């Protein structure tokens, strides 16, 4: 979502709009969610309907609501013109049988289909338009939801989506019109600025402005945390970046960064959040830790259906969000505090978290760090105590394999059996254990091949 302050216009995609306001799914670590791979569904529909089915149709519509203009756009998966009817199609693949599809799981896809159907009706001046949502597991397991409405009915449903999104648009408008100008004009929060701090800040500003890197060493007591955050906030207000990530390796330094963010927020109103480790904030960690399925955790069941109200409440009440505020709000709405905190980062200017959220492939922020190339968002990365990064990287990209575990499995092929406690699961396909036991160097060579495919860099064989 982007907000144009001059035109008072919100630019948002259909996918983001519906994901924000009609995502009623549950948290399910088993992967039973809808997946974005739509090629198989498109192939199926093209084979079934031929030229009557058109893939990838771009649509957009601008409406006025609550004093703002909304420009909603997206690419509809397909349009079916058959039997005098025009139908907007939304397709999705699932990781399990379609019999598991519930109304909550389908809500987001239906919302997207309604939005595209309305935009199609407006673009082609249709009195009646239909939508079809197709869920595909395999050729023998396909589920379809299909309905038809008048253009007026579709418009009413579309405007309801916009109205549900208005609180989130207001947050973005506040960021652009209030917080960023205040951040640009941010005054140093202390009476005096030490010369070492001034030099430190100049290096940070230079690195941010020109897109470089700065490795800065300063003695204890210099005020490094504020010296790093203050120029980063100024740069944020000047448009050099969209978000600041403050990476730490210790809880104490994270709390120091949170305290510095509070001082800056007191005058500029910038929003900051501290992300705790999933293991620490899991509400069932004492009973059945991190069993993220609707059956095991009641908070996982329908989590996203309750998240929107919780986000609106906490960002209204807090500028700087700590673990206590997250837990209190999560308890009130019966949602997962960890997933809740991840969603809150999208409404914050400063994200304070462990460096594993960047360097660990299993934990990193996919919503922020998966994109690459031109056009990707610009972020400011601040690493506290950067000398700890080497050991953390070794721990994140490494794995430990105990020879005693291998011997227990005899001469069978090793496949997902080397799972050391507290370490990443190590998978070696078609590595014969007879060679492993009697010639460990063969094992190491096998792991090096596996390493090149899986991007693991360090391996330790413990006898």
Pin down the residues of each PLM region:
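Walker A/P-loop
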Residues: 210-231
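Alpha-helix boundary/capping motif
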Residues: 417, 436-437, 442, 452-458
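Conserved pre-motif I regulatory segment
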Residues: 175-216
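Metal-dependent nuclease catalytic cores that hydrolyze phosphodiester bonds in DNA/RNA
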Residues: 1-81
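Walker A/P-loop NTP-binding motif
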Residues: 225-239, 260-263
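Signature of the SF2 helicase/ATPase Hel1-core->accessory helical subdomain module
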Residues: 333-334, 338-350, 355-425, 430, ...
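Mg2+/Mn2+-dependent nuclease catalytic core
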Residues: 61-156
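A substrate-engagement module of RecA-like helicase motors
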Residues: 181, 187, 240-351, 355-359
């Amino acid at each position: 979502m982007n907000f144009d302050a001059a035109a008072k216009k919100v630019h948002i995609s259909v996918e983001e709009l519906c994901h924000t306001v009609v995502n009623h799914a549950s948290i399910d670590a088993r992967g039973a969610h809808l997946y974005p791979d739509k090629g198989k569904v498109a192939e199926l529909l093209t084979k079934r309907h031929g030229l009557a089915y058109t893939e990838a149709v771009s649509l957009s519509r601008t409406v006025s609501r609550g004093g703002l203009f909304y420009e909603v756009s997206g690419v509809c998966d397909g349009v079916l013109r058959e039997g005098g009817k025009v139908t907007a199609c939304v397709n999705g693949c699932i990781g399990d049988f379609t019999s598991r599809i519930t109304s909550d799981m389908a809500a987001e896809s239906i919302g997207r289909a309604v939005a595209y159907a309305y935009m199609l009706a407006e673009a082609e001046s249709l009195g009646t338009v239909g939508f079809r949502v197709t869920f595909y597991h395999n050729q023998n397991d396909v589920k379809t939801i299909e309905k038809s409405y008048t253009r007026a009915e579709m418009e009413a449903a579309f405007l309801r989506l916009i109205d549900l999104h208005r609180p989130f648009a207001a947050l973005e408008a506040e960021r652009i019109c209030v917080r960023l100008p205040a951040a640009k004009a941010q005054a140093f929060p202390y009476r005096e600025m030490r010369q070492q701090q001034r030099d430190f800040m100049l290096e940070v500003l230079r690195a941010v402005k020109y897109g470089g890197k700065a490795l800065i060493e300063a003695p204890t007591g210099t005020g490094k945390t504020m010296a790093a955050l203050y120029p980063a906030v100024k740069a944020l207000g000047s448009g050099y970046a969209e978000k600041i990530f403050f990476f730490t390796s210790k809880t104490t330094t994270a709390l120091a960064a949170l305290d510095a963010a509070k001082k800056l927020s007191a005058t500029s109103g910038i929003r900051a959040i501290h992300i705790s480790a999933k293991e620490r904030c899991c509400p069932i960690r004492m009973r059945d830790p991190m069993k993220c399925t609707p059956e095991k955790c009641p908070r996982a069941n329908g989590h996203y259906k309750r998240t929107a109200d919780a986000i609106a409440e906490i960002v209204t009440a807090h500028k700087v969000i700590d673990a206590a505020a997250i837990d209190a709000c999560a308890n009130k709405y019966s949602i997962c505090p960890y997933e809740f905190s991840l969603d809150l980062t999208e409404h914050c200017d400063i994200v304070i978290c462990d460096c594993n959220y960047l360097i660990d492939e299993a934990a990193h922020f996919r919503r922020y760090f998966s994109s690459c190339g031109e056009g990707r968002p610009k972020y400011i990365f601040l690493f506290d105590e950067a000398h700890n990064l080497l050991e953390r990287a070794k721990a994140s990209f490494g794995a430990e394999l105990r020879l005693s575990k291998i011997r227990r499995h005899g001469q069978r092929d090793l496949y997902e059996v080397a799972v050391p406690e507290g370490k990443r699961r190590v998978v070696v396909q078609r590595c014969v254990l007879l060679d492993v036991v009697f010639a460990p160097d063969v094992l190491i060579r096998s792991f090096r091949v596996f390493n090149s495919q899986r991007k693991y860099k360090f391996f330790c064989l413990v006898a």
